[in-house]
Amino acid sequence: MPEEAETFAFQAEIAQLMSLIINTFYSNKEIFLRELISNASDALDKIRYESLTDPSKLDSGKELYIKLIPNKTAGTLTIIDTGIGMTKSDLVNNLGTIAKSGTKAFMEALQAGADISMIGQFGVGFYSAYLVADKVTVTSKNNDDEQYVWESSAGGSFTVRADNSEPLGRGTKIVLYIKEDQTDYLEESKIKEIVNKHSQFIGYPIKLLVEKEREKEVSDDEADDEKKEGDEKKEMETDEPKIEDVGEDEDADKKDKDAKKKKTIKEKYTEDEELNKTKPIWTRNPDDISQEEYGEFYKSLTNDWEDHLAVKHFSVEGQLEFRALLFIPRRTPFDLFENQKKRNNIKLYVRRVFIMDNCEDLIPEYLNFMKGVVDSEDLPLNISREMLQQNKVLKVIRKNLVKKTMELIEELTEDKENYKKFYDQFSKNLKLGVHEDSNNRAKLADFLRFHTSASGDDFCSLADYVSRMKDNQKHVYFITGESKDQVSNSAFVERVKARGFEVVYMTEPIDEYVIQHLKEYKGKQLVSVTKEGLELPEDESEKKKREEDKAKFESLCKLMKSILDNKVEKVVVSNRLVDSPCCIVTSQFGWSANMERIMKAQALRDTATMGYMAGKKQLEINPDHPIVETLRQKADADKNDKAVKDLVILLFETSLLSSGFSLDSPQVHASRIYRMIKLGLGIDEDEPMTTDDAQSAGDAPSLVEDTEDASHMEEVD
């Protein structure tokens, strides 16, 4: 008597995904088999790993394999594995009621035009079964539970019931009820083609139940019976009478007996045929492996639908022995920088036995995009995660993996087109490496690429920059900001560019962290053009003019400092401005304006740190600008002129904005601007305003307090 089934509803996102898979036309449906074989391989990995510390786990079935059984009569394709199996709660949770983190991300990618073959990268590969099947049953037996069956025709729900039919021992059996228009997936040749294409490097035997013919020798009357049937048919078809020769009966009987011994018939039978007999690719000589084989192995390893960008195959021998195969993918995974997610990019083997695929100590976090395998001869087979953390062998392997990755990236830099593809995807990883890896900082700095004031639309390396430096240039000049357009038009680069010096544009938030650790490159100090103390090479006449300007504007600087009070640390004459009247620079050791903006955007920022790390501001004025010169004349004429005070505040707030800072009271600043506009248009302050005007003016501080001062305002161009 069949057990009563429990019915469950699919979680909303999963139901939506299944609907998308079923109702959308996809040309490459064959990937369903790759995904199910990959899942089976993962289940086998898990039971093998558990058995290393507890061999009794394999008492329920010693042999580890994957088996494919096509049945044309029933219209089903069955995939069996002897892996870890699933408990009842695993079936309910993993196959329907709990959405994986990648479910939503995959749907969004699909709707944006991504390929269905990406499904495995998002952890929802099982549902690809519905590309070719209208009903799926999953029978599973875990060592810790009874045998259960999961079943669904994808109508928004699924059932789970206890299963008392043929026992599996341990593992999972998936039966796909193939759609009528997809029966080619029941053909042996098609299945072999797909396995060879996608799964030939799976580490367990993949067996296909094939139908064959063989000749069978018979010594009984079976062959005669078949022949008699055939002869009777022929007799009925002809009118000629049969003539018997009685005298020859004895001879005929003797001949018949001899003939019976030799007669053979053809019979059909089934047997398992192993489809993936290739030995692990990393154990072979790199000279004997084609790029196509590397490509197929990479896809099999990672579930990626695209080829890899670069590969490094090497072995280390001596006191320590291991082989490794490292790949750089073409694009970043959707969850590259999710801190809580455990990476499974580098698979660790010990003497060809899979140990684990999420060993965090195998490669540093900034290289977590690398994929591949490491096969050690020296680690113990039953090593635990805790033991790994203390293991000296692993530390040596890690050091070698980082070194070889650096070599691989360096080789990639020689191919400009491919390196651009790599850098577009993984530049943040390299920059994170500069921040975190002091041992490889200099090497990683070689890999960085930036726009500069001389590079146009192309990126260039710091080495290119240094090679173009002028004879009298001591430093590498850089500016950080939000975009190339913003920094290239910044007041800070005016004088540097006018002198013919190149400026590096750093426009990613992570660049701010890079320059905290990258203080110099090839002996040249990196100098920010937005911070105090900028020194530019100058001749005697320029030095003399600067000293004269300093003396000439000394009184204005003091006045501006007294007006601005603690808003700025000091006011000085600038040597970096050409077209702008003034700018705000920060102290050497505080944050730049860009870093301050980034930190203010942090949701969990430390307000105490904000207080002392926000750099002390310094106002620099341009002695050659007409606004500053006119302001000096007005201040010399009357230090107590209220218009001068308002103009100084207005200049300060405007330079804050143009230097990349934000205003504490933007509304007050806006009101000052509106008053200036009114004065410029000749609108009398005493003229009655409309309600809207009154609201917009708000509590704006007056620019001037009497009409006499108003006339002073109008004099400033």
From Swiss-Prot:
Primary location group: cytoplasm
Disruption phenotype: RNAi-mediated knockdown is lethal at third instar larva stage and shows decreased levels of sicily, ND-42, and ND-30.
Residue numbers carrying Phosphotyrosine: 294
Keyword Nucleotide-binding: yes
Modified sites of kind Phosphoserine: 219
Segments carrying motif TPR repeat-binding: 713-717
Pfam families given in the database record: HATPase_c_3, HSP90
Result of altering residue 368 to K: In strain: DPF-2, DPF-30, DPF-62, MA-10.2, DPF-82.1, 178.7, DPF-13, MA-4.4, EM-10, VC-805, MA-4.2, DPF-46, DPF-77, VC-815 and 709.6
Binding site for ATP: 39, 81, 100, 126, 385
Induction line: In contrast to other major heat shock proteins, this one is also expressed at normal growth temperatures. It is also developmentally expressed during oogenesis.
InterPro entries from the UniProt entry: HATPase_C_sf, Heat_shock_protein_90_CS, HSP90_C, Hsp90_fam, Hsp90_N, Ribosomal_Su5_D2-typ_SF
Cysteine disulfide partners in this protein: none
Keyword set, alphabetical order: ATP-binding, Chaperone, Cytoplasm, Nucleotide-binding, Phosphoprotein, Stress response
GO BP term, pick one: pole plasm mRNA localization
SMART domains: HATPase_c
Residue numbers spanned by region Disordered: 213-263, 685-717
GO CC aspect terms: centrosome; cytoplasm; cytosol; endoplasmic reticulum chaperone complex; mitochondrion; perinuclear region of cytoplasm; plasma membrane; polytene chromosome interband
Keyword Nucleotide-binding set for record: yes
GO molecular function: ATP binding; ATP hydrolysis activity; ATP-dependent protein folding chaperone; insulin receptor binding; TPR domain binding; unfolded protein binding
Biased composition (Basic and acidic residues): 225-245
Chain's role: Molecular chaperone that promotes the maturation, structural maintenance and proper regulation of specific target proteins involved for instance in cell cycle control and signal transduction. Undergoes a functional cycle that is linked to its ATPase activity. This cycle probably induces conformational changes in the client proteins, thereby causing their activation. Interacts dynamically with various co-chaperones that modulate its substrate recognition, ATPase cycle and chaperone function.
Subunit structure: Homodimer. Forms a complex with Hop and piwi; probably Hop mediates the interaction between piwi and Hsp83. Forms a complex including sicily, ND-42 and Hsp83; the complex is necessary to chaperone ND-42 in the cytoplasm before mitochondrial import; the interaction with sicily is direct and is dependent on its ATPase activity. Interacts with shu. Interacts with Nup358 (via TPR repeats); the interaction is required for the nuclear import of the sesquiterpenoid juvenile hormone receptor Met. Forms a complex with Dpit47 and Hsp70aa. Interacts with mora.
Protein family: Belongs to the heat shock protein 90 family.
Name of this chain's protein: Heat shock protein 83
